[in-house]
Every structure is written in C-alpha cells, then in structure tokens.
C-alpha cells in the first residue's frame, strides 16, 4: 500500500474537463463533456510522475465525497486501470481517500464495488467517442503491485524528462519505447 498526495483536477460528477497545465502552473478548463457524461470519480494527478502521454500521472480517487479542483488530499494506491488514449499509454492509478475512516477497509481493487470499476471502465472507454470511435481503449485493471511499479516508472520519467515540452517528450519516447504507443 502506498500513500500519495493527489492534486484534484476534476470533481466527481462534473461534466467539465479540467487539466493541469505544467507550463503555466495552473488548472485550466479543457472542454465540456458531451451528452450526459460525468466523471465517475474525483480525478487528479501526481506532480512528481510523468506518464507516457506527456502529462502528469492520473489518479482516480474513490470517495463518497466530491473534492474541488485545486485541492490536495492524502490517498493510498489500490490498483490501476490500463488505458490507451489516442495511441498513447494513459494509465489511471486507482486510489482511495486516506483520511476517510469509512474507507479504511479498502486495501485492494477487490475491496471496491465491482459496479464502480465497470462504471469507470465504461466512462473512459466512451467519453471521447464523439471525436472518433475507439479513440480510448481500456484494457483492464491491475493490482497494487503493478500500480506501484508504474508509479515508480513515471517518477523516473518526470525526473529525467519532465523539463521537455510535451510534443518533444512524446516524440522521443515513441522512438525509445514504441511498446508504450499504438501508432
């Protein structure tokens, strides 16, 4: 079990897609989701980890509460959702709010409601389909051990390449690690 501090970008049940802009150091509005799509979880990022899509590593925070964009909270990693977004690896760590006594019993993905896991899989498989069908692909869930390895790998990427502009990072990584991209 790993403790992390998650910076919240998007509140659970929001239809507004916010995104952290590392260059400006701010959370900005990216777009409004289409139709009745709403985020099924609080959505945040880890500022010390860079995912293969050139953005900070994403975290879905399981909680009964909604947290405002721009807030930080303590969480513990319980797994991950493997995802490809427009050809780029875009992993979502799954964590639970660590300061909520009601969630103390959740130590692994198996402790979460399977319907909630199906809901996040459906959401992330479909929320961009209006752009192009199949733009996002969710290949499944991984356990805590896998998630912690992915987090460490992304921390290493941030340390080595976090200074690069996003497009330059992706171009470099596509050559060095083609297995992380679907082109």
From Swiss-Prot:
InterPro entries assigned: Pyrophosphatase, Pyrophosphatase_sf
Reactions catalysed according to its record: diphosphate + H2O = 2 phosphate + H(+)
Record's keyword annotation contains Ligase: no
Disulfide bonds listed in the record: none
Chief location category: cytoplasm
Binding, Mg(2+) 2: 58
Single annotated GO MF: magnesium ion binding
Top-level EC class as recorded in UniProt: hydrolase
Subcellular location: Cytoplasm
BP term (GO), one: phosphate-containing compound metabolic process
Binding site for substrate: 17, 31, 43, 127
Cofactor: Mg(2+)
A GO CC annotation given for this chain: cytoplasm
Residues that coordinate or bind Mg(2+) 1: 53, 58, 90
Enzyme Commission (EC) number: 3.6.1.1
Keywords from the UniProt entry: Cytoplasm, Hydrolase, Magnesium, Metal-binding
Free-text function comment from the UniProt entry: Catalyzes the hydrolysis of inorganic pyrophosphate (PPi) forming two phosphate ions.
Alphabetized PANTHER family for the sequence: INORGANIC PYROPHOSPHATASE
Oligomer and partners: Homohexamer.
HAMAP family: Inorganic_PPase
Family recorded in the similarity comment: Belongs to the PPase family.
Protein name stated in the entry: Inorganic pyrophosphatase
Organism annotation: Mycoplasmopsis pulmonis (strain UAB CTIP) (Mycoplasma pulmonis)
């Amino acid at each position: 079990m790993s403790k992390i501090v998650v910076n919240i970008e998007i509140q659970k049940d929001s239809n507004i897609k916010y995104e952290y802009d590392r260059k400006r150091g701010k959370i900005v509005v990216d777009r409004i989701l289409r139709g009745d799509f709403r985020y099924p979880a609080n959505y945040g990022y880890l500022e010390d980890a860079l995912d293969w899509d050139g953005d900070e590593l994403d975290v879905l925070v399981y909680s009964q509460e909604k947290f405002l964009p721009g807030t930080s909270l303590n969480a513990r990693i319980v797994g991950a959702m493997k995802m490809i977004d427009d050809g780029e690896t875009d992993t979502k760590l799954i964590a639970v709010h660590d300061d909520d006594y009601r969630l103390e019993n959740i130590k692994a993905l198996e402790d979460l409601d399977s319907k909630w896991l199906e809901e996040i899989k459906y959401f992330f498989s479909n929320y961009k389909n209006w752009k192009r069908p199949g733009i996002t692909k969710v290949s499944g869930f991984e356990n805590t051990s896998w998630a912690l390895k992915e987090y460490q790998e992304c921390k290493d990427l941030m340390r080595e390449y976090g200074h690069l502009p996003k497009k330059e990072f992706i171009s470099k990584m596509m050559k060095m690690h083609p297995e992380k991209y679907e082109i």
